[in-house]
Amino acid sequence: LTPSWDTDDNIFITAQASNITIANPTGTPVNGQTIMIRIKFNAVYTITYGTNYRAFVAALPTAGVAGKTLFLGLIANTTDTKVDTTAMSEV
């Protein structure tokens, strides 16, 4: 999965059926710009991230849980050239 600052506001994956890599976003971000990612997992799968992701409050999840939905909020931080990741929760 490669989010794009130029075209994505929300990304919905309704039946993730394999391991997933969330690559660094492409495009030109505006400082503070957001993208919300929602992924529902069919089984337990690993999650890996590009090198620009930075978690706040808790570590980024490394596995999806069968039958659960993961929410990730991405915030462009052009000052630090990072993707600040917030709003992590699994329901």
Residue ranges and their predicted role:
Residues L1-T7:
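Predominantly extracellular/luminal regions of secreted and cell-surface proteins
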Residues T7-I13:
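Short carbohydrate-recognition loop motifs
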Residues T14-V91:
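Acidic, glycine/polar-enriched metal-coordinating patches/loops
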